[in-house]
């Protein structure tokens, strides 16, 4: 990801866009791993801008296509990159035609939990956001085809530290160069889709 020629030396990971058919609907999934927090918010906001441009271009050519953006955004749902640039909103009623629905916003804000912990506080960098045509608006309960049903942070005991200083944190594979037989420092997120 870079914006200016001078930035090309600092180019970061790109995006993977996969298009296909899921439950008879045309779907594109854009997988991301946005720049780290050490790089500053500018590059994550630039990533959000580029992902939004990709999503908008796809929908310009096929307005019925359902688009899912997912990955480690290295930002919370409340951060500018997600909320103001990608326009991923936490309330279905707030989602405009060019925006996306972010079910993780309220998980972080209201439930005060997330997918990783840093200095005792939860962050929710791992997100799956959806275009409006995947989400039934409260004013329109009729749903056609594939649509959003529910979501969860996949929190299971075997994924968490059960004792010591890091109790309750995601159980990493290694810590301080020592193998601790864990899975990841991030918990997975799941979005459930249905056709019913």
Please report, for each region that a protein language model flagged, where it lies by residue.
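Solvent-exposed, acidic/flexible segments
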Residues: 8-11, 40-48, 118-122, 184
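Metal-dependent phosphoester-hydrolase catalytic domains
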Residues: 57-65, 75-196
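A long, amphipathic alpha-helix that forms part
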Residues: 41-63
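Second-shell loop/turn segments in exported
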Residues: 5-6, 34-44, 69-70, 113-118, ...
């Amino acid at each position: 990801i870079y914006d200016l020629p001078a930035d090309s030396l600092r180019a970061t990971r790109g995006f993977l866009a996969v298009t296909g058919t899921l439950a008879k609907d045309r779907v594109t999934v854009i997988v991301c791993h946005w720049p780290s927090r050490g790089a500053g918010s500018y590059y994550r906001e630039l990533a959000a801008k580029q992902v939004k441009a990709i999503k908008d271009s796809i929908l310009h050519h096929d307005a019925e296509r359902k688009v899912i953006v997912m990955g480690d955004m290295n930002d919370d749902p409340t951060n500018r990159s997600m909320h103001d640039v990608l326009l991923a909103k936490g309330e279905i009623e707030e989602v405009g035609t060019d925006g996306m629905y972010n079910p993780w916003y309220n998980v972080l804000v209201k439930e005060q939990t997330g997918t990783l912990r840093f200095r005792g506080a939860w962050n929710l960098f791992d997100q799956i956001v959806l275009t409006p045509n995947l989400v039934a608006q409260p004013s329109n309960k009729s749903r056609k085809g594939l649509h959003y049903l529910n979501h969860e942070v996949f929190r299971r005991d075997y994924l968490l530290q059960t004792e010591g200083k890091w109790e309750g944190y995601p159980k990493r594979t290694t810590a301080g160069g020592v193998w601790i037989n864990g899975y990841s420092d991030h918990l997975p997120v799941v979005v459930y889709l249905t056709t019913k």
